[in-house]
C-alpha cells in the first residue's frame, strides 16, 4: 500500500489515490515478539479495507479466517526455533497461499515465508513456511537502509527499506519490480511475488 508521505528527491505523484474498498475484508495481522514492526499508517490503510484480527505465529495461534494475511517485520531470527515448531500454522499458511490467499509480507514477514532461516554463522537452518523458494540468513548481515521508489505494473510506490537479513541466491526467483533510491539510483533488492503473495 502506498504511504501518504512525499519523500525527498521524488516527483509528486498520486500518492493520495488510495480508495477504500466497498467490500469489507477480513484481515489477519501477525503480532507478537517476532513480528512487531507494524507502522500505524499500514494499520490505518488496512482498517479502511475491513476488520482486523491479530494472531501470534510465535505462540502458536491458528491462522484466522481471512481475506488478507499481513506478516509485518520484526525479529523472526530471534524466534526461529519457536517458529520452526509451529508446523500447523506453517501448513495453514502454505495451503492458504497455494489456494490463492492474499499475503502481504515485509522484512521479517518475508523471512517467515522462505524455506529456511539461519540466524548465525554455523547455526541451524530452521525450516520456515517454504512458500517462497528462497533461503534467508543473518550470516554476513549488513544494513540495507533508505527511502525507496518502486515501479510495479505501471504504478509507483514509495516507502523505505530497512533490514539486515540477506536472501541466499536471490536470483532463484525473479524480482517483479525495480527499486530506486530517493535520488533515482537503482538498487538490487528484489521484490518477490508468488501467486497472491
What residue ranges belong to the model's regions?
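Electropositive phosphate-/nucleotide-binding environments in soluble metabolic enzymes
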Residues: 36-40, 87, 156
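Conserved acidic residues
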Residues: 67
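Cysteine-nucleophile active-site neighborhood
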Residues: 75-149
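C-terminal accessory "lid"/substrate-recognition subdomains
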Residues: 1-56, 70
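Short acidic low-complexity segments
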Residues: 55-64
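Amide-donor transfer/coupling interface in amidating biosynthetic enzymes
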Residues: 1-26, 137-197
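Fold-independent oxyanion-binding glycine-rich loops
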Residues: 30-33, 57, 72-74, 115, ...
